[in-house]
């Protein structure tokens, strides 16, 4: 099975991979960071996973946590850390895409 997509690199170096499927009125956003547990030093482990969880606590632009606004929008989201990467993801109604990208 082949899935059609486009890939663009923004001026800030962020790679954007886009696949469009208009079957349902939802959007999935998945942000990958090219850092994971393999980047940790022996004896100093767990930081990649810690930072993944800290992403859910808010930011300078949004200090109310990650999950409440997604839940209010009827969305689902989570994150993961593996040796090669850390990521966060959201699945939202198309009308909540800006929220998912903002968080």
What are these regions (language model features)?
Residues 1-25:
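N- or domain-start disorder-to-order transition segments that initiate the globular core
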Residues 28-98:
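M16/MPP (pitrilysin/insulinase) zinc-metallopeptidase core fold and M16-derived inactive scaffolds
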Residues 101-103:
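Short amphipathic alpha-helices in soluble, non-transmembrane regions
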